[in-house]
């Protein structure tokens, strides 16, 4: 077994009694010594298989932790169309055309990271995307991951038409005549579109995406991550990676609780999270809590506000208090952390009230 001595560096320890050190010794995947060079040399004296790395004054930091990620989605997105730098609608269309030309055999085109600001007040709609690509479905995740912008072919593939009802907690964008515009908000995006796209992904696809995310993290010095929206297929991919020795990082996850409109079904999801938490109590993966999307975001005017937005819209919360309270109470009673997304003032009040009542009930 090789023991490695790293010496001659500036090592940040995060220990208030010894914030900096010169050397560290690693053996069997664990640090056996952190301190001064001279003491490290003495600690390593007589070690049969010793490898020495001269740091030459380099700074060494503990591994970083990404406190909010979606691992499998992150890995998959590395191969998708990135629209973050699009300057305006025309530039976005040009990038989409170029991506389509680069992927002539792809049955559908997936991208993301687009922002509302470059559209200069123009509402995103299917026609703008159709002008660039009309022969294949196009799915573009917004930068905040709360909306998906699709073209006409994607609406048809999803089976969404003017008569399709809004899902619980979401909205299908419609024009003044009631026609679907190609914008899917909140659970219409995360449910209708994401669930469809997820159904097309194989276990091998998920494994490759996870491997890509882990490789990108390790290259950047990230050794731990908190996945804020874990689902069953993604958890299975994580467990496969851990079993095969491919995971490479430690993961704490929050199980996504999706609104169903059925109190029993909502609570059943908490039970599922608890079962996974108990099953994965030890090891590199654990279910730390639940994730609940109480409302949307400001950019797409889906945050639950007490006053209307400038366009006159005033959407309600994804989770009203009477539905949210029993879920939060049950998760807290099960020993699960409760992570809630709440941006609007109405949603924030709902989230805080649910927490207060859970504390009152559970102590």
How would you describe each model-predicted region?
Residues 3-7, 12, 16-268, 288, ...:
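Divalent metal-binding segments
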Residues 267-277:
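Substrate-binding cleft/loops of secretory-pathway carbohydrate-active enzymes
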């Amino acid at each position: 077994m090789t023991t490695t001595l790293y010496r001659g560096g500036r090592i940040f320890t995060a220990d208030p009694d010894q914030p900096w050190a010169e050397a560290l010794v690693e053996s069997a995947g664990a640090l056996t010594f952190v301190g001064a060079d001279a003491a490290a040399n003495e600690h390593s004296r007589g070690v049969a298989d010793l490898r020495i790395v001269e740091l030459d004054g380099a700074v060494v930091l503990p591994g970083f932790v990404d406190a909010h990620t979606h691992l499998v989605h992150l890995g998959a997105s590395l191969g998708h169309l990135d629209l973050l730098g699009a300057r305006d609608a025309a530039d976005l269309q040009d990038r989409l055309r170029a991506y389509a030309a680069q992927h002539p055999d792809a049955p559908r085109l997936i991208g993301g990271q687009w922002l509302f600001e470059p559209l200069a007040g123009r509402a995103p709609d299917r026609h703008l995307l159709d002008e660039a690509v009309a022969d294949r479905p196009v799915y573009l995740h917004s930068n905040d991951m709360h909306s998906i912008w699709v073209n006409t072919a994607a609406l048809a593939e999803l089976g969404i038409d003017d008569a399709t009802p809004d899902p619980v907690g979401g909205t299908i964008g419609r024009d003044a005549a009631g026609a679907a515009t190609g914008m899917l908000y909140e659970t219409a995006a995360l449910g209708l579109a994401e669930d469809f796209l997820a159904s097309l992904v194989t276990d091998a696809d998920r494994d490759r995406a996870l491997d890509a995310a882990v490789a990108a993290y390790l290259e950047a010095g990230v050794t731990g991550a908190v996945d804020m929206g874990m689902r069953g297929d993604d958890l299975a991919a994580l467990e496969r990676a851990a079993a095969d020795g491919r995971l490479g990082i430690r993961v704490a996850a929050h199980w996504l609780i999706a609104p169903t409109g059925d109190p029993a079904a909502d609570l059943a999801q908490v039970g599922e999270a608890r079962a996974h938490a108990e099953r994965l109590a030890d090891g590199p993966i654990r279910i730390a809590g639940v994730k609940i999307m109480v409302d949307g975001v400001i950019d797409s005017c889906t945050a639950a506000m007490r006053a209307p937005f400038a366009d006159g819209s005033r959407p309600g919360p994804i989770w009203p208090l009477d539905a949210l309270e029993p879920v939060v109470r049950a998760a807290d009673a099960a020993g699960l952390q409760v992570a809630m997304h709440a941006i609007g003032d109405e949603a924030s009040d709902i989230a805080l009230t649910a927490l207060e009542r859970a504390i009152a009930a559970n102590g």
